[in-house]
């Protein structure tokens, strides 16, 4: 297999692990390349995750942010597996002490766990896809925004809140959960609408069919920000419109045998 290794470089341990895993995988006959930031740290020829990039597998060493950042860098589908070098690591299925064992066991065709993403248009312009969520928040603290929410052209609600999360099942264990949204099995395809600190007690989260088109209109005159997967942000103003649909291109994760509820139990310590 051709395997690309991506790693956070702000900590010594992930970089050292990237080096040792690369040696191990090469000894097993794999073609190993390194994404440009970690390649620079290790003195290897860099590879850019651009439209010309190709690999059978991307191994990400880091936390959930590293995985989200890697997937947003790709403009086509490549299977990803994460090795947890962060904190919770809900998107990183492999713990450090199991990395060599699990990577050694992988072979083509890889067992895949596709995850639904949402595509986002802002004022008629595509701003990409989100694996976890798109969030509209006030650009100034303690200011309330007003949103009109439409599903398939029908207005279903109007929120006054600090913000609004439009999330995926994968994102249901991230920001949406901390805002009071439900935990949704990642094998279900749906969209979540979760208001942030709503003014009205009657404002509640929605779970919407993934085949629906969701339109969010910012009625408020106050400035706001659109943040996608915690990575990219855009300034939005009065009468801004967002269209959210199910993306035709899911994110592809390697299935290493850890079920969704096993991860919920371990990562969130519910039991």
Curated annotation (Swiss-Prot):
Protein name: NAD kinase
Annotated HAMAP family: NAD_kinase
Similarity remark: Belongs to the NAD kinase family.
Transmembrane regions: none
Sorted UniProt keywords: ATP-binding, Cytoplasm, Kinase, NAD, NADP, Nucleotide-binding, Transferase
Active site, renumbered: 64
SUPFAM superfamilies: NAD kinase/diacylglycerol kinase-like (SSF111331)
GO cellular component: a single term: cytoplasm
InterPro entries membership: ATP-NAD_kinase_N, ATP-NAD_kinase_PpnK-typ_C, NAD/diacylglycerol_kinase_sf, NADK
EC number(s) on file: 2.7.1.23
PANTHER family: BIFUNCTIONAL NADP PHOSPHATASE_NAD KINASE, NAD KINASE
Enzyme class, first EC level, given as a word: transferase
Keyword Cytoplasm: yes
GO process annotations (BP): NAD metabolic process; NADP biosynthetic process
GO molecular function: ATP binding; metal ion binding; NAD+ kinase activity
Catalytic activity line of the entry: NAD(+) + ATP = ADP + NADP(+) + H(+)
Pfam families, alphabetized: NAD_kinase (PF01513), NAD_kinase_C (PF20143)
Primary location group: cytoplasm
Residues that bind NAD(+): 64-65, 69, 132-133, 143, 160, 162, 173-178, 197, 231
Taxonomic classification: Archaea, Methanobacteriati, Methanobacteriota, Stenosarchaea group, Methanomicrobia
Organism, scientific name: Methanocorpusculum labreanum (strain ATCC 43576 / DSM 4855 / Z)
